[in-house]
Amino acid sequence: WGGAPSPIEAAMMAANMAPGRNRSFTAEEWPHIIGKKVWYDAMDEAEEMIDLSVETDIQGYDIDEDMVKIARENARMAGVDKLIHFQRRGVEDLHHPKKYGFIITNPPYGERLQDKSQMPQLYRTIGERFRELDSWSMYLITAYEQAEKDIGRKADKNRKIYNRMPKTYYYQFLGPKPPKRRDV
């Protein structure tokens, strides 16, 4: 996942963190449009809304230990490292005890994979692991043209996107909706 943007963004959403909270904006320098007090009051309000005590089950995996270290550091810098469990793990070891959940993945493809002959087997393994999580959904970004074929299932939705290269796809493999929780 190249530094774990998906798990980090999920943790930030779970903790009610405003996107871009640690960066500056050109609009801050436009006091004639947005007064400084209004700007800083909004920033203070956004900080007060953060809840790092939220319980999460967000996990990030990569087979490359260096990428896991980078992901942990990125999560620490974003302030959500306590909300994510990172682990060195290959897709062949993907399993989870929960009945419902979802996978967000951007597996290697094309230039990101040293040996392109490994792609069919990688995507078959993704499909096998996903089938075992039969109540889960999977959201997959790839430029690999044979993804659906090798996964062994046609995506419920397929969108073309641009991920620094043409013909990148966002596949949505939808599982059943979990039952609604009842307030106790």
Language-model segments: residues:
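Conserved S-adenosyl-L-methionine
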Residues: W1-H95, E111-R112, Q118
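C-terminal catalytic and target-recognition region of SAM-dependent MTase-like enzymes
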Residues: G90-D93, P97-V184
